[in-house]
Amino acid sequence: MTNPAPSDALVIAGKHYRSRLLTGTGKFKDLDETRLATEAAAAEIVTVAIRRVNIGQDPNAPSLLDVLPPERYTLLPNTAGCYTAEDAVRTCRLARELLDGHNLTKLEVLGDEKTLYPDVVQTLKAAEQLVADGFEVMVYTSDDPILAKRLEDIGCVAVMPLAAPIGSGLGIQNKYNLLEIIENAKVPIIVDAGVGTASDAAIAMELGCDGVLMNTAIAGARDPILMASAMRKAIEAGREAFLAGRIPRKRYASASSPVDGVIG
């Protein structure tokens, strides 16, 4: 589930992770495909929609824990489908009970069914309650830099701005807002929602995001297992490119070969 601290670890709530790709568990055709895609992604943190996925609520139905055991993965229960702070807090408390006191949670409070944009007022309210209740909150939010900082100040352990609407596959729509969030953050910034393909994930990492969470981009692909593998490589490549430092953009050419010793 967690590993000894490598030189470039993703650190969330004091735990070190080698993988910067977080994956969802919804929309797959069955639990076996969920397992195979998660393995291909090399994900260590997997999100679980408590309202939609069985992790023990129904002892007579197949459980996600059968294929993604907590001993191997960090399960990140989320509040998908919640539209009020009260509902989100109630869902988090249920998850903590089902997972034997597990405090790490992903908070999302939606504004409407059409856009699935976060309701920022309800999100702030829920975040304050959950942090006060001892939860380690990773929070889905808009790409508003002021709001992102406010959620960090409340005590959220990671801030997760959207790249585009959930499930849209549009990719990053406002990289300048993301850069502003990243540059001012003291907690991990993880892009959540809107990624469509590997290049989207790579761009997020090149900008300096600490990780990317995705579900539809993998589960909705023609070959989810292959896409999971592609996303893993994109995350790794984007992170390495960020650490390496890209060359500056210039208007005019710059010769790659030296002029010293040119004949003539």
Swiss-Prot record:
Residue positions binding 1-deoxy-D-xylulose 5-phosphate: 167, 193-194, 215-216
Gene Ontology molecular function: any one: thiazole synthase activity
Short name of one Pfam family: ThiG
Record: active site: 106 (schiff-base intermediate with dxp)
GO CC terms of this entry: cytoplasm
Keyword vocabulary terms for this entry: Cytoplasm, Schiff base, Thiamine biosynthesis, Transferase
Coiled-coil region list: none
SUPFAM superfamilies, per the entry: ThiG-like
Subcellular location: Cytoplasm
Family as reported in the entry's similarity comment: Belongs to the ThiG family.
Subunit field text: Homotetramer. Forms heterodimers with either ThiH or ThiS.
Protein name per UniProt: Thiazole synthase
Originating species: Xanthomonas axonopodis pv. citri (strain 306)
